[in-house]
């Protein structure tokens, strides 16, 4: 019979389209872990109507802590006592809040080059929540808070299906002020600002945690991870106190996707140069260099051709 004691959840922090789904899939290979796909409405229990994702320690009241810890424990017990692993992207703006609720959890932080992230993100701005995702979200949401999320879903469906808007109202991390920025930025510029604000906020919050708890955070860049995925995944597991068998590491090495390294080269060079002043400084902080040469038309055609074979879709950041 599984223990009714809450095991420290494994919390992976990372922006949208940064590789967190891949790494969550690797944790799912372990018999000791059950993964929970982005239980956003559980995390926002403190303030479901807030128009941004920034939550602090002050939001983690005793009632909120009790509710969220009980929800994680319930999921753990429903899965035979396995440790719960989750990777809700908006939690990148909630590090102090999460640390207050789960001080026993050691954190993992994944960051990715914003140009590569943008090439994946813009297409998602064009999609509303599908029926299956909606039903899952509905089951996860506290019954007293359903109306907050129903309104957002109806609003985005109305924009897409009735007004024929290309993009949903907001997709991805909502930093404070994003709705004002949306009025003056292009979608590509807004995605760039999302990356910058999330990176700055999360890094500062993690620095604060490490000042009092050295070694509490494992930080890795996506680009470094895929160069030696088995090694870095073993380090992640060790960081959170999870054993890992060689067979799992072999599978990680086999499954890691290294094909997306040059995906940013499909972006329109005009878009790349437009977001340069937004992202360049924060890229440098994370060890990235802004490209000095733009992709050639031949490179872009090759990447687009390859992607059409695998996905059949493209976003407005791409120019034929």
Model regions: which residues?
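PAPS-dependent sulfotransferase catalytic core
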Residues: 1-79, 128, 137-149, 255, ...
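PAPS-dependent sulfotransferases, especially Golgi type II membrane carbohydrate sulfotransferases
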Residues: 1-10, 133, 147-320
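Short beta-strand segments
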Residues: 12-14, 84-87, 109-111, 219-222
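Short catalytic/ligand-binding loop motif for oxyanion handling, primarily in non-cytosolic enzymes
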Residues: 21-24, 43-45, 92-95, 115-120, ...
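Short aromatic-enriched loop/helix-cap "lid" or pocket-rim segments at secondary-structure transitions
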Residues: 46-50, 98, 119-124, 129-133, ...
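Glycine-rich phosphate-binding loop used to anchor ATP phosphates in small-molecule kinases
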Residues: 72-94
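Conserved phosphate-donor/acceptor-positioning beta-strand/loop module used by diverse small-molecule
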Residues: 87, 98-124, 236
């Amino acid at each position: 019979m599984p223990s009714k004691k809450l095991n420290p959840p494994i919390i992976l922090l990372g922006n949208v389209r940064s590789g967190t789904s891949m790494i969550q899939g690797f944790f799912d290979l372990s018999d000791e872990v059950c993964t929970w796909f982005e239980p956003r409405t559980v995390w926002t229990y403190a303030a479901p109507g807030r128009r941004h994702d920034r939550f602090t320690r002050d939001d983690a009241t005793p009632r909120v802590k009790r509710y969220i810890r009980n929800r994680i424990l319930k999921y753990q017990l429903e899965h035979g006592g396995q440790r719960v692993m989750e990777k809700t992207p908006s939690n990148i703006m909630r590090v102090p809040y999460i640390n207050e609720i789960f001080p026993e959890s050691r954190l993992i932080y994944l960051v990715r080059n914003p140009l590569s992230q943008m090439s994946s993100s813009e297409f998602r701005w064009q999609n509303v929540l599908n029926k299956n995702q909606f039903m899952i979200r509905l089951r996860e949401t506290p019954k007293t808070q359903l109306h907050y999320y129903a309104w957002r879903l109806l609003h985005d469906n109305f924009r897409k299906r009735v007004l024929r808007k290309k993009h949903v109202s907001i997709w991805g991390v909502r930093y404070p002020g994003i709705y004002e920025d949306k009025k003056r930025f292009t979608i590509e510029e807004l995605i760039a600002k999302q990356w910058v604000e999330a990176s700055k906020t999360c890094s500062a919050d993690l620095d604060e945690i490490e000042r009092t708890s050295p070694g509490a955070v494992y930080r890795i860049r996506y680009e470094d991870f895929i160069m030696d995925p088995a090694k870095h995944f073993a380090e992640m597991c060790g960081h959170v106190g999870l054993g890992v068998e060689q067979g799992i590491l072999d599978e990680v090495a086999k499954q890691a996707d290294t094909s997306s390294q040059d995906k940013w080269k499909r972006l329109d060079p005009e878009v790349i140069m437009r977001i340069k002043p937004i992202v360049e400084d924060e890229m440098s902080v994370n060890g990235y260099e802004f490209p000095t040469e733009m992709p050639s038309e031949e490179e872009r055609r090759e990447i687009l051709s390859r992607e059409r074979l695998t996905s059949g879709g493209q976003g407005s950041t791409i120019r034929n």
